[in-house]
């Protein structure tokens, strides 16, 4: 079962992973009232469809004030997005996730999945975040690190250190990385997921 990004963020928060503040909107009524929970002046408006490639199809927009935010939400609702994963018919935008924007200095890719061959959990990490990971795997396989861990009650710190090796993090960033990786590990096991991915 695929879930929407806003649902995945709720699960990540439930398991202690740091995430940006955001809200999901299912219609365009009383938008200003709904947006009051958001604090920053910069926002990311994200169409919620079950397909990758939303950004290239116009389904992810950065806006810098509440007026433009309301306008962008109204324009995006009901729009049909066509991406490399939707087919020609595309997918209609029926819900939108609005998130407080973060200053991006670096983008990373991190996922964990069940490796059936070894009966272990495989963590895949890359410094090439924000991109199509399949393309990175094909064009720059040296930019991807895979580390397999035993299925246990919790992940060992020595494993986490190996997983975050490519990221070159400072002490504070490592604290957040530990929380995120521990959350991914627990979500994969407790939610019986086949893949948990952050890109």
List each language-model region with its residue ranges.
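ATP-grasp fold ATP-binding core
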Residues: 5-8, 12, 39-54, 83-103, ...
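Electropositive phosphate-/nucleotide-binding environments in soluble metabolic enzymes
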Residues: 2-6, 25-28, 63-70, 104, ...
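A conserved helix-loop-beta module that forms one wall/lid of the active-site cleft
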Residues: 1-41
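Glycine-rich, mobile lid/loop segments that gate access to catalytic sites or pores
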Residues: 148-198
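Glycine-rich phosphate-binding loop of ATP-grasp-fold ATP-dependent ligases
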Residues: 20-22, 45-72, 109, 132-133
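Hydrophobic alpha-helical hairpins/lids featuring a short glycine-rich hinge
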Residues: 83-148
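Gly-rich Lys/Arg/Thr-decorated short loops/hinges at beta-loop-alpha junctions or inter-strand turns
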Residues: 13-14, 54-55, 142-145, 155-165
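Catalytic core of tubulin tyrosine ligase-like
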Residues: 19, 66-86, 163
